[in-house]
Amino acid sequence: MDTEDDPLLQDAWLDEEDEEVAFSSRKRREGALLCGKSSCRVRPLRVTLPVSGFWNIVGWIFTNPYCAGFILFLGCAIPAVLAVVMFLHYPALDIDISYNAFEIRNHESSQRFDALALALKSQFGSWGRNRRDLADFTSETLQRLIFEQLQQLHLNASHLQVSTRAKRSAPQGRTSSPEPRAHPHPGNETSRVTRGAPRWDYSNTYISANTQTHAHWRIELIFLARGDSENNIFTTERLVTIHEVERKIMDHPRFREFCWKPHEVLKDLPLGSYSYCSPPSSLMTYFFPTERGGKIYYDGMGQDLADIQGSLELAMTHPEFYWYVDEGLSAENKKSSLLRSEILFGAPLPNYYSVEDRWEEQRHKFQNFVVTYVAMLAKQSTSKVQVLYGGTDLFDYEVRRTFNNDMLLAFISSSCIAVLVYILTSCSVFLSFFGIASIGLSCLVALFLYHVVFGIQYLGILNGVAAFVIVGIGVDDVFVFINTYRQATHLKDLRLRMIHTIQTAGKATFFTSLTTAAAYAANIFSQIPAVHDFGLFMSLIVSCCWVAVLFTMPAALGIWTLYVSPLESSCQNSCSQKCTKKSTLHLAEDLFVASEGTSRAGRETLPYLDDDIPLLSVEEEPVSLEMGDVPLVSVMPENLQLPVEKSNRGHLIAHLQELLEHWVLWSAVKSRWVIVGLFLLVLLLSIFFASRLRPASRAPVLFRPDTNIQVLLDLKYNLSAEGISCITCSGLFQEKPHSLQNNFRTSLEKKKRGSASPWGSKGSISDTGQQDLQGTVYISKSRSKGRPAIYRFSLNASIPAPWQMVSPGDGEVPSFQVYRVPFGNFTRKLTACVSTVGLLKQTSPRKWMMTTLSCDSKRGWKFDFSFYVAAKEQQRTRKLYFAQSHKPPYHGRVCVAPPGCLLSSSPDGPTKGILYVPSEKAAPKARLSATSGFNPCMNMGCGKPAVRPLVDTGAMVFVVFGIRGVNRTKNSDNHVIGDMGSVIYDDSFDLFKEIGNLCRLCKAIASNTELVKPGGAQCLPSGYSISSFLQMLHPECKNIPEPNLLPGQLSHGAVGVKDGKVQWISMAFESTTYKGKSSFQTYADYLKWETFLQQQLQLFPEGSALRHGFQTCEHWKQIFMEIIGVQSALYGLILSLVICVAAVAVFTTHILLLLPVLLSILGVVCLVVTIMYWSGWEMGAVEAISLSILVGSSVDYCVHLVEGYLLAGENLPLHHAEDPTACRQWRTIEAIRHVGVAIVSSAVTTVIATVPLFFCIIAPFAKFGKIVALNTGVSILYTLTVSTALLSIMGPGTFTRSRTSCLKAVAGVLLAGLLGLCICLALLKGGFKIPLPNGTAL
């Protein structure tokens, strides 16, 4: 039974009101005021009869120490028991750090494209070392199968010649059967069986005594070139750096225990020192070969760098080469900004019988081993090379370490709030403990519901925000109960005081928790997994937190009043007497300091820091609200007196209160129309800019942009052939050992040709002969007063007078090494010219200069000597500069670096430039290794470069048959980059049975010029002319459309072959869709493709496997991610707005009070979105979450202002009652006076609580914190300006809330909802399609 329905309880309330009237002496000086509909009783009945009914039982339970203690025990025991049950009897709850959590993986477009990509990956991953071209492989295999089919068709024919030819062709085709079928390729196993899959995924493995023969784990390395404008990774310095990093990895003390040891490595003799571990899968195998027994082994174990261009030419003859480089490298442009490497590790480990033998134990050992590389790899980057490292286990380790470090910042936020709780509970340890405990224990209950009831196995990485947010939300509820209980000191009966606390605080916290939980719950409808899980988890936490506080805090307050409060008061009084010189009365039962002697002498202020309940300080007699709410009045118990001196806190809040009063007097009275005008202008501009916020064009940035893992994730989308498993792509597997003799000409031939071999070995010139090819240019100078120094160049070390030796330093070069004849890459000829023109013979009889041309005899220059240098940087070279002065006597100079040789401002030319000479250390005093500068393509060349494989699916539309979909049921989703799943094949698909229908469909699609560009049909894979053979199978296959491909370009059409059967086929078509169009425009093209294909498929007979075909495109996947992301955000925003509007309508019960709230929310949301647009953000997952939360968090401040407006109307002065304008302004000013300090303090504390989020490495945390702080600042600004101005203009003057108005509001909300439903039904009946959050339409 409610208190307002009990006359006895009303008399008790009136008794307390009479005491309040007696206490407030200032009230009598201000005259009579309007007291509402209730009459003021001077002599209320003093009835102390107990309350009966439900609330009497509730009050007795929470004030009985045994019942209250039992409730506290249950509040702690139930969450603990649920947590134990969850952790012991259910699968472990892990952190979902998958990048796929931010992609819409369950949509049809994603499933189709992933299925095709996996099928291509499986087919491409089956390359053998002797079959490097997928197009030739598939073409030959398909040709063989066609021959076999033709043989079967003509088996009973009478033409013996044709039959014999078919029989000869069949065995010939079988000889080209791919090696991987007979010998399962390790690459195929690795690409499907990695990422910590459970043991039942290893059905293809076999028990073997050989350890570490199966490649199961890997470390991914990417080396980025930096430090110059060219950013070419193929330079001497960068390649040496990369080689050193790879050698450091192999030199790890425990590397041999985990490395991969394939049987092919046993043939590589130099790897014996590494226990025949496989070297990194890297291009370093070409650049750093080793020489053993007159043979070159491409294993990357050499100490010296081979010839860069020659090694590149050799590597580019294999299509696997393109896996290591970026997309820009080609035969014409042999430059790459990056290089990829993989370090492979094998299973089973030593002392394990097989891969399946104690698999989890093996995996745990490897994880403990591989993380020891992190510290070393983090220090390997140089000014020229940035080293990025990753891989499944390193990714997971780095993400979890980052996540844990960021969670430590949550402790800083929680600690600050805990201190705030301790202060605002009057330093009560008991209340502070149970307040924080109720929040923490509610999280365990929410976790149980999330994991057990809803069956979600992983916590999304975004859920870490809950650690920051929930403490602030829960503490607000705790403050509400404590403050409401503290304010009810006028209720002497403890039971009545507890009932009043539960009713008032429970309603207030229910309203705010409902709007907050609804804002988070709106994200449940999002198709982005991370957003969906975050919305569910946060809504559960907010709801559980409210329930926990609702039961825990009243019980704690009951025990605190009976037993703990006296002890805390005596302790605090004792400390106060010892620590202060002046005797002050400690207000242990108040959270406010009254201000005296101000210009507002008749008013008292409550400095609350909470924004969830109406904080009203009125001096008039309060009137009970008909809704059952009891106004929170500021009263002083009779036994207390005000302190003589005000504290600093009182001064601060008094100043803030005075500032707010002056502010609202300006905004609500003097400049209200100006504010409204500015608001409408800003609103229109905000709507314009907010509408320009574009959907995200990529998955969100998960980490700070400069971190190792984020740079690596960004590169994931730009790497060549990312989907290919390429563990055998290095030179170790692609090249057999080469004989060193085959690459050398005799020294006599080289001398005749004027060149020499850059390596010393058998069959090459001797070390002495090589030394004879080198020479030294000596430099001396002559200097006289007032004249510039003249430099002399000579091949003779003697220095005649008046020349002097040049000392090192200041850019001077005493001498440098050169080659007398062209040697290797030292082929740039420089000529030293001498002249006597314009010189004084006594000081410097001659002058010298250097030029790349011949000496200019017309100007007096004569030939002295010539030598050879390198035009580009080489191994063991140093860089020098030469230049000719543009002033008399026009002499030349060689120096170490500018500005010494910048004698002229002209660009590089014949007499000015850069030369690379052998360094002094490189002088061949000792024998060089056989591989130093080795050029494998010197004699016969290495052949033509391989064509870049086009297995990446660009803007093509693929029509696929033989694939039903993708199976993701057994995937482990807690990896940064996890597996996409496995392909579900259509076993009923038979290529030769459906060949006629396929040819007919290919022609039909190719002839549709609205969808396909002319010449854009690629129905068959590249290679031999398969179309000519297809004509023999079916007449429909005549005149198959031929694609317009560039010379050497491969077709995007693909065929999957397994066990001698065509498993699936993919026809590619170059669509007319322009990729630059918006996603919503491209969606129309998708519908055209889907409609046309379905029409064609329906023409096939019933039961045909072709009816299961589908069309897919990577572009469709991208546009649906954008469309569904935006639609999910909009639906979340609309749902959150509807719930908030309904709740506010029921709470305010008046349309003119609802309208200012709605306008304020609209203004806040639009302005925040506009700032997001100005900041360059896109509508991604984090922004989608924020949009819905903005509504729920924006509504609090303005609603509390409206609540203060309503409560002020209960005590409206008589002289304002007849003037609506004055009445609205007075009520607005009173509302700000009563709740202004509270909402401002709450906003400040909210912003401060989000500051630790700014420093998080996880980017969504930092962005979420910025959005919450921004929204809080804009919301409080709009509340103090726009909301006050709108209330003073359109607020109802004399309206007071009643039960009747509440029922009308509920009826209005239900009617509006029914009307909206009817409109939707009418639109659907009229043929209008309503888009749904999942991308479909009703």
Curated annotation (Swiss-Prot):
Residue ranges of domain SSD in the record: 401-559
Annotated keywords: Cholesterol metabolism, Cytoplasmic vesicle, Differentiation, Endoplasmic reticulum, Lipid metabolism, Membrane, Nucleus, Steroid metabolism, Sterol metabolism, Transmembrane, Transmembrane helix
Predominant place of localization: endoplasmic reticulum
GO cellular component: cytoplasm; cytoplasmic vesicle membrane; endoplasmic reticulum; endoplasmic reticulum membrane; membrane; nuclear membrane
Pfam family, one: DUF7023
GO biological process per UniProt: cell differentiation; cholesterol homeostasis; cholesterol metabolic process; negative regulation of neuron differentiation; positive regulation of lipid metabolic process; positive regulation of neural precursor cell proliferation; response to hormone
Ranges per topology, Cytoplasmic: 1-67, 428, 474-517, 561-672, 1150, 1259-1266, 1324-1338
PROSITE patterns: SSD
Coiled-coil region: none
Tissue-wise expression: Expressed in retina, hippocampus and cerebellum. Expressed in the ganglion and bipolar cells of the inner and outer nuclear layers of the retina and in Purkinje cells (at protein level). Expressed strongly in brain and retina, weakly in testis and bone marrow.
Membrane topology: Multi-pass membrane protein
Side Lumenal, residues: 89-406, 450-452, 539, 694-1128, 1172-1237, 1288-1302
Entry's induction text: Down-regulated by thyroid hormone T3 in retinal ganglion layers during the embryonic development.
Stretches the record annotates as Disordered: 164-196, 747-768
Localization annotation: Endoplasmic reticulum membrane; Nucleus membrane; Cytoplasmic vesicle membrane
Chain segments annotated as transmembrane: 68-88, 407-427, 429-449, 453-473, 518-538, 540-560, 673-693, 1129-1149, 1151-1171, 1238-1258, 1267-1287, 1303-1323
Superkingdom, natural source: Eukaryota
Its biological purpose: Plays a role in neuronal proliferation and differentiation. Plays a role in the accumulation of cellular cholesterol. Involved in intracellular lipid droplet formation. May contribute to cholesterol homeostasis in neuronal cells.
Entry-linked PANTHER family: PROTEIN DISPATCHED HOMOLOG 3 (PTHR46687:SF1)
Domain notes: The SSD (sterol-sensing) domain is necessary for the increase in cellular cholesterol uptake.
Similarity field: Belongs to the patched family.
The protein's name: Protein dispatched homolog 3
Organism expressing this protein natively: Gallus gallus (Chicken)
Originating gene: DISP3
